[in-house]
């Protein structure tokens, strides 16, 4: 195999990419030439793309990018008939060397959700429902041992959760949870600026300025809140549905002094119900295997559809 820098081979790269998607080797959504160029060649991400040829036939390509001290490998694909012959390794090592040479400040290469290139992929068994980007390396595929053999090491496992929302009903146990909260003066409802107070103070309490900026500018939208004596002590939302039918999850928080009482689980179930009412057909998200937030998602009925390893290789 001969490797060279990408030179306007978009159509051949797209054909390879889509073949591996259609035959089930990957979960990625098919690309067009336009989407390929937008995702892989955007100059803002300092792209590196290499192609591999056997004679005049393109049999492999790989893509990555770099931001500051971190490089990312986005994709490596090899035609089935040429696998296990070192082609993938050659592409990967060429990418690594190119990123290191052109970015002397780069210290590591990662396969992780921070990659600025997000390749959308289908939820297995639930297409056309999709997710915006893979949070790492799919542990159920040959990609995981492949990158392990190249010296990449896993440091976390990210589970992707999925829940259909078209006919969503809160789990039976949630009625009891809501009743217990109400006995303690806590209600799950929609935010009303005319009767509720303390929303900004919630973000003071949890110390998250990013969420404050995103939420406080959208108080006229539907936001699920937990309130006690009119004070906002927790929230999730705003309720928003994408054109594809995805229920969007923008964050969830509970004041520190009210945690460990099941308020987060009640808020999240209220979010799912509200998104369903607004026409959402599904929701997907990912979180770390050891993140306690997983129990909030599982309590609402979410199930794990794929597990991904975040992987890293120290370069210098």
Model-identified regions with their sequence ranges:
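A conserved beta-strand-loop-helix scaffold within acyl/acetyltransferase catalytic domains
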Residues: 24-49, 54, 60-71, 75-76, ...
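Conserved hydrophobic beta-strand within the GNAT/NAT acetyltransferase core sheet
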Residues: 73, 108-111, 249, 283-287
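Acyl-donor-binding surface of acyltransferase catalytic domains
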Residues: 93-182, 309-313
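Conserved active-site tyrosine of GNAT-family acetyltransferases
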Residues: 147, 297-298, 302
